């Protein structure tokens, strides 16, 4: 199989879907890897490194898309890339379709087989989402601390305080991978940290991890409102796999915050956790202000640390890519339940139930989509 890796074109997205090490892995499995020239430069991987690993360097993105049996990316295709979609193409990338109706329609209409990193599930975990969630969580606190500086428009708070001066208050909504790593960095900076989650079992786990160094609260409107009101930094990190993110922090809650406070919405890929966040921002223009509160809603936070993020991502994606390339999409889906859970669109059908529910499509299971195609 020919695996194509185009350069990412989303604003300031410097990650790349394949490292030279990943190229070697796929070539050793008997496949061809074509990389668009310059695709790895943002992550400090030179074209020469890919060539030495055995990849073919391709001059244009169009040729990469046209030649490939499977395209591997980091972020979802943008509208300028929809023209490359075609029946029989496998697309393996982050998709976040519940928040992307136009992309979903393009995938359905073109009959691409779209396998989403973020919904591949193993024993209740999301192994292809985890490394980027770790990066995004750690970055979220760093970013929030930066924008609390007065020069950035913040309220002039040092999260760790100093002797005789109170510490900054950080509230993390969602105690999953993102939230846990955000809390770790906030604690490391010396902040006063609260984690809010809906799952009492998870709250007990967090208490075991952090002990008495953090406060845990059950998620409900009252607790969220009280915590948000007193916070300097609020990080939204609640994700429901494949679905739109819940708007847990209301406009009224945000109006109760002090001017210069900061919100970081890590869930913006799926629509965001804050009612006042109605659009993603970019690394070029990361902040907007509403109710005198700074809103950071960049959808590709790990793109700011591309070397770390790229290596972490490809460590987990390439083994699945080898299976898909070696067996073909249908056989890989049939043989591996994890890959099955990643299939969001196939043969013109929406095959991930949460996406179908959010966007108003009829849900067709991947197994039935395969059968329907075989009957044609």
UniProtKB/Swiss-Prot annotation:
The keyword Nucleotide-binding applies. NAD(+) binds at residues 133, 177-178, 197, 219, 238-239, 266-269, 298-301. Pathway: Amino-acid degradation; L-alanine degradation via dehydrogenase pathway; NH(3) and pyruvate from L-alanine: step 1/1. It comes from the Bacteria. CDD domains: L-AlaDH. Signal peptide: none annotated. The active site is at 96 (proton donor/acceptor), 269 (proton donor/acceptor). Its EC number is 1.4.1.1. It is found in: Cytoplasm. Pfam families: AlaDh_PNT_C (PF01262), AlaDh_PNT_N (PF05222). Transmembrane segments: none annotated. Keywords: Cytoplasm, NAD, Nucleotide-binding, Oxidoreductase, Sporulation. InterPro entries: Ala_DH, Ala_DH/PNT_CS2, AlaDH/PNT_CS1, AlaDH/PNT_N, AlaDH/PNT_NAD(H)-bd, NAD(P)-bd_dom_sf. It catalyses: L-alanine + NAD(+) + H2O = pyruvate + NH4(+) + NADH + H(+). GO terms for cellular component: cytoplasm; plasma membrane. Substrate binds at residues 15, 75. GO terms for biological process: L-alanine catabolic process; sporulation resulting in formation of a cellular spore. Catalyzes the reversible reductive amination of pyruvate to L-alanine. This enzyme is a key factor in the assimilation of L-alanine as an energy source through the tricarboxylic acid cycle during sporulation. Homohexamer. Belongs to the AlaDH/PNT family. This is Alanine dehydrogenase. It comes from Oceanobacillus iheyensis (strain DSM 14371 / CIP 107618 / JCM 11309 / KCTC 3954 / HTE831).
């Amino acid at each position: 199989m020919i695996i194509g890796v185009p350069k990412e074109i989303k604003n300031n997205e410097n990650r790349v879907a394949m490292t030279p090490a990943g190229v070697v892995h796929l070539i050793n499995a008997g496949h061809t890897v074509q990389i668009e020239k310059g695709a790895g430069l943002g992550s400090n991987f030179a074209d020469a490194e890919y060539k030495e690993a055995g990849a073919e360097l391709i001059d244009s993105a169009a040729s990469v898309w046209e030649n490939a049996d499977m395209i591997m990316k980091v972020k979802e295709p943008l509208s300028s890339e929809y023209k490359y979609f075609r029946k029989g193409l496998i697309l393996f990338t982050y998709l976040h379709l519940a928040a992307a109706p136009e992309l979903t329609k393009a995938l359905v209409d073109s009959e691409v087989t779209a396998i989403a990193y973020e919904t591949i599930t193993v024993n209740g975990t999301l192994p292809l989402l985890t490394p980027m969630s770790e990066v995004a969580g750690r970055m979220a606190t760093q970013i929030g601390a930066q924008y609390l500086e007065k020069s950035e428009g913040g309220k002039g708070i040092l999260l760790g305080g100093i002797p005789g001066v109170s510490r900054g208050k950080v509230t993390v909504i969602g105690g999953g991978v993102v939230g846990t790593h955000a809390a770790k960095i906030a604690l490391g900076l010396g902040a006063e940290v609260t984690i809010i989650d809906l799952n009492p079992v998870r709250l007990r786990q967090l208490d075991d991890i952090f002990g008495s160094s953090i406060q845990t609260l059950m998620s409900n409107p009252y607790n969220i409102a009280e915590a948000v009101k007193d916070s300097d930094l609020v990080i939204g990190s609640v994700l429901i796999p494949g679905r739109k993110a819940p708007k847990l922090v209301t406009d009224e809650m945000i109006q109760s915050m002090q001017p210069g406070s900061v919100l970081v919405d890590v869930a913006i890929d799926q629509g965001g956790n804050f009612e006042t966040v109605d659009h993603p921002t970019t690394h070029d223009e990361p902040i907007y202000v509403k109710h005198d509160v700074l809103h950071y809603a960049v959808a590709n936070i790990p793109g700011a640390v591309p070397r770390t993020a790229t290596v972490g991502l490809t460590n987990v994606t390439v083994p699945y890519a080898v299976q898909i390339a070696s067996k073909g999409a249908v056989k890989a889906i049939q043989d591996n339940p994890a890959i099955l859970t990643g299939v969001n669109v196939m043969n013109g059908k929406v095959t991930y139930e949460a996406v179908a529910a959010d966007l108003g499509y009829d849900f067709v299971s991947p197994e039935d989509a395969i059968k329907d195609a075989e009957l044609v």
